[in-house]
């Protein structure tokens, strides 16, 4: 029997944000609400902060609540107030500042994703700050974004009164602030956001929602050898891995990622990590305990470099464009000519590679793109190898000294046999070399002459000197 696994997420509310009266906003109670003649049950379900809506349907939905016919009542009405194309005149009546900032947030514009995809696929370097999922063209990179990637931005319209944690995309304000669609009551608009609202978008790409809850995507062939019953509703096979200690303790996503992160209050960030305001030190006093793990030689390490238990990694991706096929265009909201076929393989969910970020600190990196691409505009297929920084959200006890100081994977060289002798690093890769001279799971080679690509200036793999320092460090 095949069990479909929607989520392995415990929805625990640690923080319930109180609803506050919005300064300068006054809701007028309007008598004679004819909406309830057909929708009497929808007066129930409101939380206190939105209880005015029980007799003021048109405040959010529009329409005419004095009309007596269905046609007249529904004229100019919207069934989903809170979609970003109507949020200014619905949610914006009370939350104008939030609607404005959300519309400029990365969850709507995807600035960093658009910029990196264009750079890698088309080789173009445009104005990162102006990149936007709502203004895509039709070149290879933008076509890929239209057909495969832009389904997760908040501007996507919601068109069904139901929740699907795995497949849900978009919906503007509703994407986060509605947790249930009861049949006999009005959905409760709430600042209590469940992890299920994050899962639909954040279980792909970096797979943060999966990792946090202790699930990891695997190859179907691998699943056949393990527990094939573990499968998401969209068909992806997963395995159980150690969950993040914060998840195990009952912390939800919004316990750390609050409005300042999610609704662009932090500013006009281009990349996701620049929009995140929360830090480990907000809760954990960073003390330099008297032991080897915290001595000065580790001062450049980010907390997650040692405390991440594993990192989701994928080393085999193939993308092929078929101009004769048809596929849903998430910008046009219709099926259009051209289809991208995507194949993924070679998953690994183990400790990952270390690299240097733009602040000269050492953090974890994972394959952002190790793939081949085919498009009729190109004479030959393209091969792309790019590693990106990642916060895996698999926090736990610190990894062992050996897992860094005696590991070729940690150095970014990929799996294989490594040793330091005769003042030289000797490495024999476990996997065959690809066309660019590196094995599939490597980011760079020992002298840094191959690979090494990262999304942003200043990000890089460890250099030879840093590798030697890691390998020659005495172990306890």
Task: Label each PLM-derived region with a short phrase.
Residues 175, 184-185:
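Thiamine diphosphate
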Residues 187-190:
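A generic local secondary-structure boundary/capping motif
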């Amino acid at each position: 029997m095949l069990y479909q696994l929607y989520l392995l997420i415990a929805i625990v509310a640690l923080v319930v944000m109180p609803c506050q009266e919005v300064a300068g906003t006054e809701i007028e109670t309007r008598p004679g609400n004819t909406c309830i003649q057909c929708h009497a049950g929808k007066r129930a379900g409101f939380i206190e902060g939105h209880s005015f809506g029980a007799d003021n349907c048109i405040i959010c939905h529009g329409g005419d609540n004095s009309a007596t016919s269905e046609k007249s009542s529904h004229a100019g009405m919207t069934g989903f107030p809170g979609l970003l194309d109507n949020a200014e005149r619905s949610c914006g009546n009370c939350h104008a500042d939030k609607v404005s900032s959300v519309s400029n947030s990365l969850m709507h514009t995807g600035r960093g994703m658009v910029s990196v995809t264009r750079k890698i696929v088309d080789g173009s370097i445009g104005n990162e700050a102006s990149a936007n999922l709502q203004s895509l063209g039709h070149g290879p990179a933008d076509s890929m974004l239209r057909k495969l990637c832009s389904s997760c931005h908040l501007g996507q319209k919601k068109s069904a009164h139901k929740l699907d944690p795995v497949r849900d995309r978009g919906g503007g304000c509703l994407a986060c602030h509605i947790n249930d669609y009861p049949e006999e009551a009005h959905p409760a608009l709430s600042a209590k956001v469940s992890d299920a609202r994050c899962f639909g978008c954040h279980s792909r790409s970096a797979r943060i929602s999966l990792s946090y809850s202790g699930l990891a995507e695997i190859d179907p062939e691998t699943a056949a050898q393990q527990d094939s019953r573990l499968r998401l509703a969209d068909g992806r096979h997963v395995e159980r891995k150690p969950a993040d200690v914060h998840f195990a303790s009952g912390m939800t996503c919004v316990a750390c990622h609050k409005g300042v992160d999610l609704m662009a209050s932090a500013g006009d960030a281009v990349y996701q990590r620049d929009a995140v305001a929360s830090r480990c030190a907000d809760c954990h006093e960073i003390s330099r305990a008297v032991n080897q793990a915290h001595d000065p030689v580790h001062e450049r390490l980010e907390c997650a470099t040692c405390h991440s238990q594993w990192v989701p990694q994928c080393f085999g991706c193939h993308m092929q464009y078929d101009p004769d096929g048809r596929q849903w265009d998430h910008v046009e909201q219709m099926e259009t000519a051209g289809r991208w076929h995507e194949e993924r393989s070679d998953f690994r969910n183990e400790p990952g590679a270390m690299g240097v970020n733009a602040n000269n600190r050492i953090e974890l990196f994972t394959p952002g793109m190790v793939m081949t691409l085919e498009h009729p505009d190109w004479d030959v297929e393209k091969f792309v190898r790019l590693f990106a920084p990642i916060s895996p959200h698999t926090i736990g006890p610190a990894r062992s000294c050996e897992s860094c100081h005696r590991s070729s994977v940690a150095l970014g060289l990929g799996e294989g046999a490594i040793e330091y002798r005769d003042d030289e690093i000797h490495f024999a890769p476990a996997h065959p070399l690809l066309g660019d001279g590196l094995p599939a799971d490597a980011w760079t080679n020992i002298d840094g002459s191959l690979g090494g690509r990262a999304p942003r200036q200043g990000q890089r793999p460890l250099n030879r000197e840093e590798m030697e320092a890691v390998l020659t460090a005495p172990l306890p």
